[in-house]
Amino acid sequence: MFLSCLSGGEISFAENGKAQCLIALPDKPTGFERDAADDLSSYLGQMTGAKFTVLPESKIPAGKSVIYVGQTNYARKQNIRFNQLSAEEWVIKATGSNLILSGGKPIGSFYAVWTLLNQFGCYCLTWDQDAVPNHKTLKREIRPEQSKPSFSGRFIYNRYPPILKYTQASAQVIQN
C-alpha cells in the first residue's frame, strides 16, 4: 500500500531553536526503535539547536505535540497494522499536530526516521561525516508515506573492515 498521494499535515518541530514537540517510544522499545528515537532527537537537535526529549509513550503529558517512533499504541489506534508490514517497511503519517514514524520489525521504524531526516536534507555521508542543515525554525508539510526497500542486503563495502587492515607481526613470529 502506497500512501504518498494522500494529503498530510503540517508539523512544527522547532521554532527559534525551541522544540515544539516531544518524541515518544513504546513503553518497551526494541533496540532499533530506541536507536531511531535517539537519532531523531540528536539530528533534529543539531539542525535546530533545540533539545528534543524522548519519553516512553505512557509518560507523555496531555496536550503536547508528539512524534511517535516505533510500534506505539498511538500508531495502532491510528490504524497502522504492524502485522501487515514487512521487516523493513516503514510508515510516515501526520495526525493533527502529531507524527507517526513506524514500521515493521525489526528495523522499519528506523527507516521511517531516516526517510524523514533525509527529506530535511540530513544525511550520513560516511561513518564519520554527516550533512546536517541549519533550521532554527523547522515546520514541514508531512505527506503520508508507506514504503519499503526494493531489496534487502543493501550494504556498500568500500574497504576492508579495520580488523583486516595491515598489522605488524611480532618479532617472535618473524624469527621462527
Predicted regions and their residues:
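Feature activates predominantly on carbohydrate-active enzymes
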Residues: 36-39, 43, 61, 82-176
